[in-house]
A protein has these predicted regions:
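Alpha-helical transmembrane segments and immediately membrane-proximal extracytoplasmic
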Residues: 1-398
Length: 398
């Protein structure tokens, strides 16, 4: 391609990225603000809502079966389109995944929101690209939408950009999409913030110097354990989804029956502490409040069980919660500042579980500031190496 043609095509993609960023940012603001309100309502009234989790599961399943069964594939469908294995994403996926996630959270399921935002962005950008007969490469449009979805919801445009270009193919950066993805992520973040969706950020007060042997070894241990935790999450989620699908093949039966013990355990153990996104645990970790030694493990178990039986929602915010709570505990055991270790865990467990490297480092920069960037790089690189190409997105292409 000649330089002039390349510049013209790039400008077309950037214009589309701006359009996608505005629309997806607005949808993210709606989705995120409603989800926050729902979460606050559930926290107050969980004893009346959790018993109806099985019924909510049946309603979610019925919605998909009636309106768009193909949309049940969720992120799998996004990856199939990105890897040219499929060429269609139903627009109905957007309202279905939003409503399904709201219901999951309202009635106490343990799940996230990032996967939902990414699906929203990818679906919209893919539809616009097809509608406008957009040139040549549908994958770039998909990456633009994924970056907008992530960036609009979390307002971390750098990590959103690198997440989107890293995640489609393991070990391969989609640099062709870099500038358009960056534009869509920044526009989406600006739009959602302008519409009242707040960004989460924390100033880390205590840091460490990598001067002593003990400190260096402790940081390496952190990276290894965070990496193993992300790997455990990804491996367990994949295996449990397969097991549930093979053991109880009827989706209505699977979600209706298995949600009964899920709701009971969520109710009994610390009164819905492990329901929802896990932002309560994240807030406690960075506020110096009570973090139990088993918080990270129970949040992991409840999240993979919720998602494996068919409820809707993402994985990333629970991963942030798992990393934060594990970091607090490990910080105390290793003699390192707990808040700093919580921040490192927040980023590194996410990176390991999603099998991304640059995205979690950028999360560290955008959420916690640049003062500890060297530590974030070291811990995230180690966690990424420990992971071994296992991802929550089983369809990532190696």
């Amino acid at each position: 391609m000649q330089k002039k043609d390349y510049i013209i095509q790039l400008l077309k993609y950037i214009i589309m990225a701006i359009v996608v960023g505005i629309i997806v940012g607005a949808i993210d603001a709606l989705f995120g603000r409603v989800l926050i309100a729902i979460s606050e309502f559930r926290t107050i009234h969980y004893q009346y809502l959790l018993p109806f989790l099985p019924i909510a599961g049946l309603v979610i399943t019925a919605m998909y079966y009636v309106f768009s069964k193909l949309s049940l594939k969720g992120m799998k469908l996004i990856f199939e389109v990105g890897q040219q294995k499929s060429d269609a994403i139903p627009l109905l996926l957007i309202p279905l995944v939003m409503i399904g996630t709201w219901l999951t959270h309202l009635f106490g399921g343990s799940a996230g929101r990032e996967g939902v935002a990414v699906q929203i962005g990818a679906t919209l950008s893919h539809a616009l690209g097809r509608k406008l007969n957009f040139p040549e490469n549908g994958r770039i449009m998909l990456v633009i939408g994924m970056a907008a979805g992530f960036g609009g919801l979390f307002q971390t445009p750098l990590s959103a950009t690198f997440f989107a270009i890293e995640v489609i193919v393991i070990g391969k950066m989609d640099y062709e999409a870099l500038l358009p993805a960056l534009a869509s992520a920044y526009i989406a973040a600006f739009t959602s913030h302008s519409l009242g969706l707040e960004k989460f950020s924390v100033a880390i007060k205590n840091t460490i110097n990598l001067t002593g042997t003990k400190t260096i070894i402790s940081v390496i241990i952190l990276g290894i354990l965070f990496g193993l935790t992300g790997r455990l999450f990804s491996f367990s989620l994949s295996k449990l989804k397969v097991f549930m699908g093979e053991t109880i093949m009827n989706q209505y039966l699977r979600i209706g029956v298995m949600a009964i013990p899920l709701a009971a355990l969520l109710f009994i153990i610390h009164g819905s502490r492990y329901s929802g996104l896990g932002t309560n645990i994240i807030s406690a970790g960075f506020a110096g409040q009570t973090i139990y030694s088993y918080d990270w493990f129970l949040k992991l178990l409840f999240t993979i069980f919720t998602l494996a039986i068919g409820f809707q929602g993402g994985e990333v915010t629970p991963l942030f919660s798992i990393g934060t709570s594990l970091g607090v505990i490990l910080g105390g055991l290793l003699g390192l500042p707990p808040m700093l270790c919580a921040a490192l865990g927040y980023a590194a467990v996410f990176g390991s579980a999603t099998n991304t490297l640059i995205a979690p480092i950028m999360i560290g920069l955008e959420v916690f500031g640049g003062a500890d960037m060297v530590l974030f790089v070291i811990v995230c690189v180690i966690a990424y190496g420990v992971n071994g190409n296992i991802s929550i997105y089983a369809q990532e292409k190696i």
